[in-house]
């Protein structure tokens, strides 16, 4: 006996459920050995939907708009306006379902854009999967707001909404003490300036140097640094003897949490791909300089002694290597991880 064919309504319902499962990741924290499979399965799943052409985007957006108009007409009729005929109501309901199907399709086809942007923010206080979740919410909003008649490519339009959703999600959830979004943005600016000065000076910049470079007055820099502290150092003594520090009182969990494993794997993959484009000597210099192999950065002098070159030659090679990594094919990937 031949299998029963699914009705258009059933197909629409199944597609919508699939989109919901894809766009909204589960918040349960899996066991450590589950996480690579979960992330890999998600990436495989979202890759199953082909990317859209400009014509596809227009067609889907047109169907979405038709569905919105049909829904509004039904809601108006339900609030007391003259009711549509049964045939008209059936047509409107089918149009609503078709619009929802088109919306789900556009969301699924652009989930890879969210992952690409989420990787650039995953190291800023939220696990990678949580950042993807925030970005997916922005993507859904972009699909709802997209106006194809203005001639924009959807990915260009959606990027703004995804970035805003991720930034606000980080501002809301990434800190133990919640800070206003504008304060978080100032802290991010301050952190970038400090990294730039630290790299150029080869030492920690003073408050005055940070203020001058950032254009923020000294008192505001001091205040931002104070409110930006989100944790007590594990090396802080708990009494006057100094024999016991805060870290001694915290039990060792032995393993990283699963979302952290996924985040570190994503970053490690990006770094391996980028540094692998360098010559072996330059690759070693960057690995030592920034602690890529053991998490312990070295000074220029320490690197020079290790590789048998002068301090100035190491500085030159480091500068040349970083310039190579700032090339267009590498710049977006790595600078966004460092932002």
Swiss-Prot record:
Keywords: DNA-binding, Sigma factor, Transcription, Transcription regulation. Residues 1-37, 71-101 are annotated as: Disordered. InterPro entries: RNA_pol_sigma-70_dom, RNA_pol_sigma70, RNA_pol_sigma70_r1_2, RNA_pol_sigma70_r2, RNA_pol_sigma70_r3, RNA_pol_sigma70_r4, RNA_pol_sigma_r2, RNA_pol_sigma_r3/r4-like. Residues 300-319 bind DNA. One of its GO terms (molecular function) is sigma factor activity. Residues 1-10 have a biased composition (Low complexity). A motif (Polymerase core binding) lies at residues 130-143. It holds the Pfam family Sigma70_r3. One of its GO terms (biological process) is DNA-templated transcription initiation. Residues 91-101 have a biased composition (Basic and acidic residues). Disulfide bonds: none annotated. Belongs to the sigma-70 factor family. Sigma factors are initiation factors that promote the attachment of RNA polymerase to specific initiation sites and are then released. Interacts transiently with the RNA polymerase catalytic core. NCBIfam families: sigma70-ECF (TIGR02937). This is RNA polymerase principal sigma factor HrdC.
């Amino acid at each position: 006996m031949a299998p029963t064919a699914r009705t258009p309504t059933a197909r629409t319902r199944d597609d919508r459920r699939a989109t919901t499962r894809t766009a909204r990741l589960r918040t349960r924290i899996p066991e450590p050995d589950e996480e690579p499979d979960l992330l890999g399965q998600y990436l495989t799943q979202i890759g199953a939907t082909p990317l859209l052409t400009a014509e596809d985007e227009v067609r889907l957006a047109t169907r979405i708009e038709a569905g919105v108009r049909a829904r509004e007409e039904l809601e108006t009729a339900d609030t007391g306006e003259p009711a549509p005929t049964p045939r008209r109501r059936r047509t409107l309901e089918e149009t609503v379902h078709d619009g929802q199907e088109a919306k789900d399709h556009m969301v699924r086809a652009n989930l890879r854009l969210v992952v690409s942007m989420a990787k650039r923010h995953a190291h800023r206080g939220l696990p990678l999967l949580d950042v993807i979740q925030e970005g997916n919410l922005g993507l859904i909003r972009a699909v709802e707001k997209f106006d194809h008649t203005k001639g924009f490519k959807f990915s260009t339009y959606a990027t703004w909404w995804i970035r805003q959703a991720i930034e606000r999600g980080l501002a809301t959830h990434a800190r133990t003490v919640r800070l206003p979004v504008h304060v978080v943005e100032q802290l991010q600016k301050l952190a970038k300036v400090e990294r730039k000065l630290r790299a150029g000076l080869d030492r920690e910049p003073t408050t005055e140097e940070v203020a001058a470079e950032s254009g923020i007055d000294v008192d505001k820099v001091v205040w931002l640094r104070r409110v930006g502290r989100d944790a007590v150092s594990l090396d802080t003594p708990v009494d006057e003897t100094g024999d016991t520090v805060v870290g001694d009182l915290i039990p060792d969990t032995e393993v990283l949490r699963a979302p952290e494993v996924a985040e570190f794997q994503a970053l490690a993959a990006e770094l391996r791909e980028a540094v692998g484009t360098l010559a072996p000597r330059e690759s070693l210099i960057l690995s030592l300089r920034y602690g890529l192999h053991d998490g312990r950065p070295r000074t220029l002098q320490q690197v020079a002694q290790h590789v048998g070159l002068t301090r100035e030659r190491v500085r030159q090679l480091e500068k040349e290597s970083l310039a190579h990594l700032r090339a267009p094919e590498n710049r977006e990937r790595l600078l966004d991880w460092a932002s």
